[in-house]
Amino acid sequence: GEKSWVSGAGDARCKFLVVMCITKPGANLAADRQSIMLVPMDTEGVTITRMISVFGYDDAPQGHAQIKFDNVQIPITNLIGKDGQGFEIAQGRMGSGRIHQCMRSIGAAERALELMVKRSTSRFAFGKPLSELGGNVDVIANSRIEIEMSRLMALKAAWTFEDQGLLQALNVIAQMKVVVPNMALNVIDRAIQMHGGTGVSEDT
């Protein structure tokens, strides 16, 4: 088969792929059909067919690859966990992964707010700084509030995951996964607007 969006596969240092695929198609439960295994990049039949760009950027040197697996064979010792345990392993990793990614998004929003504040106090129009024009101070204040709310939700998700385990944390992780990305998109968009044309250039 083929897999797209294999992040980091284009890096020369990438020696192994962590592959999840169906190994038990006859299992009664769909969640028991997948397994996870290590596949060396130099295994016969493993081919990078193309690198995928994102908005025109190739994200070199790591990049995102499309990989073809043609009759690839590996030893049973490359299996991670047990046969059919792949979905369980992946789900266990995704909980902490989602918390991590949301915290990174909060960091990006924090940086965007920092730039927004700097721009609003250093750029003058009509004899006044931008912070004193058109309700911009409200935009900044709302961004600060939304970041703090999202941060608390992420911290709650992390605490619940650490203290009570994944199953108890699933609900708050799901909430966080909705709230945090939307917050980050809103704050970053406001920062772009505050910078005008500069906001979509490499200067910012």
Can you say where each PLM-predicted feature lies in the sequence?
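A short core secondary-structure module
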Residues: E2-T49
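A broadly conserved detector of short glycine/acidic/proline-rich loop/turn motifs that flank catalytic sites
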Residues: K3, G10, T23, T43, ...
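Alpha-helical interface subdomain recognition
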Residues: Q66-N71, K82-F87, Q91-T204
